[in-house]
Amino acid sequence: MLVIFLGILGLLASQVSSQLVGQLRPTEDPPEEELEYWCAYMESCQFCWDCQDGTCINKIDGSVIYKNEYVKSCLVSRWLDKCMYDLDKGIYHTMNCSQPWSWNPYKYFRKEWKKDEL
């Protein structure tokens, strides 16, 4: 009887832990191993960039831009198969995590940095 009880308890524990794996509470700092995913579909999120002295370097591809309205604070979250970007002020994007698509309402603000421009 004890063996059956422990077996059922183990089964329930494994189901709970597998449900938590797919969840990401709203954060401005997603896990390092997920940066490439989150930045691929909304690259103007601040966590995708290392900004200093008026320029920003992309953490994924190394591209350099001028810091301006393009780089935005973002909250990202995941629940089951829904991934969500929250840009504040009622601007958000929700997609199926397994079928993602790019979305960037700020793409027109992007200004590439050129070495000879100082």
From Swiss-Prot:
Glycans are attached at N96. N-glycosylated. One of its GO terms (cellular component) is host cell endoplasmic reticulum lumen. Pfam families: v110 (PF01639). InterPro entries: ASFV_fam_110 (IPR004848). It comes from African swine fever virus (isolate Warthog/Namibia/Wart80/1980). A motif (Prevents secretion from ER) lies at residues 115-118. Keywords: Early protein, Glycoprotein, Host endoplasmic reticulum, Signal. Induction: Expressed in the early phase of the viral replicative cycle. It is found in: Host endoplasmic reticulum lumen. The lineage of its organism: Viruses, Varidnaviria, Bamfordvirae, Nucleocytoviricota, Pokkesviricetes. Belongs to the asfivirus MGF 110 family. It comes from the Viruses. Plays a role in virus cell tropism, and may be required for efficient virus replication in macrophages. Residues 1-18 form the signal peptide. This is Protein MGF 110-6L.
